[in-house]
């Protein structure tokens, strides 16, 4: 049992390494099936396909670290994609149109944070409501129609330049490094972990937990806006169901990478690797020529499997730790020694009486 506990604790403390090993193992497996699969071009192609999910995983990580969850990111992604598309078709420049989308995403995330922190609405309930709100607003703006005829400037953002990586791909890599340093190396970043691990304790330490949570939701909205811009630049048009179902994949990517649903545990790198692994699984389905509707099924199955596996092992480890902790307080009953005879049950001899007792 001790070896089992140590093995699980090693896996739990090295979820990034576990996800990386899974990615490499999948590459090796597919390399055996198709030798052309194992090359740098395949790696960059999967990274390009994973950019939207990576951005959503970064935002979801910040929210989940504070022990919250946001299921409206798919709708925010669609709303921001519509915003940038409508602004471009209205004659605004690319930079200004992207700024509009980022402000819309930040505003949507900020509103989610207000609902959770100030109005004390549970995050899952609040964001379920805004999921429908933002989706409905998106359809109202477009009239249920697709946005087409986007300028070439937007599409150039996803055109490969250096090492087969697009400008927005390089921007995402810089963003990954910056967010990893922010959360892992700064006092402000550690405030997210403290807020999710022990809310009352963080408040007693002087951390402004409400501001931290609002900031997390706002940054989640910004990441969703960037994902919407990437989506529009990659395919060149905006369908009326843009972003639908992305929230589940974002949460699954974070859980695969070691982000705890209970808050306070995980890293950005782990979430990125989880997003890459999910996208790699999608590419495997394409290679195996399976229908596209298998993607959501596989993503849901992987998420459910990880949650069940993680929960069962966590309970087993906690039970074993409790047994070891309280084992030293358990005293074993001492068996009576049959060879030692007690003198308490012997009848008093005549020699034991005093003179006074004899006189009486």
Swiss-Prot record:
Domain of life: Bacteria
UniProt entry keywords in alphabetical sequence: Cell inner membrane, Cell membrane, Membrane, Transmembrane, Transmembrane helix, Transport
Record GO terms (molecular function): transmembrane transporter activity
Cystine pairs: none
Membrane topology: Multi-pass membrane protein
Gene Ontology CC: plasma membrane
Chain intervals with Low complexity compositional bias: 342-352
Primary location recorded for the protein, binned into one broad class: membrane
Subcellular localization, as worded in the UniProt entry: Cell inner membrane
Region of interest: Disordered: 334-360
A Pfam family matched in the record: BPD_transp_2
The keyword Transport belongs to this UniProt entry's keyword annotation: yes
Homology family: Belongs to the binding-protein-dependent transport system permease family. AraH/RbsC subfamily.
Record note on quaternary structure: The complex is composed of two ATP-binding proteins (LsrA), two transmembrane proteins (LsrC and LsrD) and a solute-binding protein (LsrB).
Cited PANTHER family: ABC TRANSPORTER PERMEASE PROTEIN YPHD-RELATED-RELATED, AUTOINDUCER 2 IMPORT SYSTEM PERMEASE PROTEIN LSRC
Stated role: Part of the ABC transporter complex LsrABCD involved in autoinducer 2 (AI-2) import. Probably responsible for the translocation of the substrate across the membrane.
Protein name according to UniProt: Autoinducer 2 import system permease protein LsrC
């Amino acid at each position: 049992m001790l070896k089992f506990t140590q093995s699980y604790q090693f896996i739990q403390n090295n979820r990034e390494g576990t996800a990386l090993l899974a990615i490499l193992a999948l590459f090796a497996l597919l390399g055996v099936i198709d030798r052309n699969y194992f090359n740098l071009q395949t790696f960059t192609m999967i990274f390009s396909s994973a950019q939207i999910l990576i951005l959503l995983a970064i935002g979801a990580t910040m929210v989940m670290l504070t022990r919250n969850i946001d299921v409206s990111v798919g709708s925010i992604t669609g709303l921001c994609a519509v915003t940038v598309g409508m602004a471009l078709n209205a004659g605004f420049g690319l930079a200004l149109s992207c700024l509009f989308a980022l402000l819309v995403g930040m505003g949507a995330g900020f509103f989610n944070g207000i609902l959770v922190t100030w109005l004390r609405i549970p995050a899952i309930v609040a964001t379920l409501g805004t999921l429908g709100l933002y989706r409905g607003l998106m359809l109202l703006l477009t009239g249920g129609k697709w946005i087409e005829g986007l300028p070439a400037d937007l599409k150039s953002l996803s055109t490969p330049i250096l090492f087969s990586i697009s400008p927005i791909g390089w921007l995402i890599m810089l963003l990954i490094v910056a967010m990893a340093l922010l959360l892992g190396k700064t006092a402000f970043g550690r405030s997210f972990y403290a807020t999710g691990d022990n809310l009352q304790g963080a408040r007693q330490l002087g951390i402004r937990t409400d501001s931290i949570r609002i900031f997390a939701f706002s940054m989640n909205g910004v990441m969703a806006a960037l994902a919407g811009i990437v989506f529009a630049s990659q395919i060149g048009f905006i369908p009326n169901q843009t972003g639908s179902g992305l929230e589940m994949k974002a949460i699954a990517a974070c859980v695969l990478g070691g982000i705890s649903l209970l808050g306070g545990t995980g890293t950005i790198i782990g979430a990125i690797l989880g997003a890459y692994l999910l996208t790699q699984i999608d590419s495997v389905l394409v290679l195996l020529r399976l229908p596209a509707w298998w993607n959501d099924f596989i993503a849901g199955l992987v998420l459910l499997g990880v949650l069940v596996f993680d929960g069962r092992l966590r309970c087993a480890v906690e039970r074993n730790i409790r047994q070891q902790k309280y084992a030293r307080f358990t005293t074993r009953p001492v068996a009576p020694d049959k060879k030692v005879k007690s003198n308490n049950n012997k009848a008093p001899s005549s020699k034991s009486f005093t003179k006074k007792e004899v006189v009486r």
